[in-house]
A protein has these predicted regions:
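Basic/aromatic recognition patch in beta-strand/loop cores that engages polyanionic ligands
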Residues: 80-105
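Enriched for short, Lys/Arg-rich terminal
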Residues: 98-100, 104-123
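Compact soluble domain cores
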Residues: 1-84
Length: 123
């Protein structure tokens, strides 16, 4: 459970994320592989498992995220990106499926690092 301070941070992050989406200043990291339903899949195939056929749909779902959907704020472990970046991790029901979403904002845009079926909190 997030603290009041963390919830305020998430609220600010979501406002910034929505502004970046409105400006189309977004990037989905589609080259990654993820574990979904116990199998390794590319990120785009994982979207199909949720019932998402168009990348633009993920941004519509992200715009509807609420503070209470966030369950963790963590640091980026991939030093190639930014070791100081905060990662915001969410769980949301989409198309009757439990979905795990990981987002961050860097100096360029809003990044969606994960958007796939929830594997009990991991990615």
């Amino acid at each position: 459970m997030l603290s009041v301070l963390d919830k305020n941070t998430v609220s600010i992050f979501l406002k910034m994320a929505r502004k970046e989406i409105e400006k189309n200043n977004v990037y989905f990291v589609g080259y990654r592989t993820v574990e979904s339903n116990g199998k390794e899949k590319n990120a785009k195939q994982a979207l199909l498992d949720i019932g998402i056929n168009n990348l633009k749909e993920i941004w519509s779902h992200i715009k509807t995220l609420e503070v209470d959907d966030c369950f963790r704020i963590s640091k980026d472990r991939d030093l190639k990106r930014d070791n100081n970046a905060e990662m915001f991790e969410f769980k949301k029901i989409i198309n009757k499926k439990n979905v795990y979403i990981k987002l961050t904002i860097n100096e360029r845009c809003l990044l969606c690092l994960s958007f796939h079926l929830d594997n009990n909190g991991g990615n």
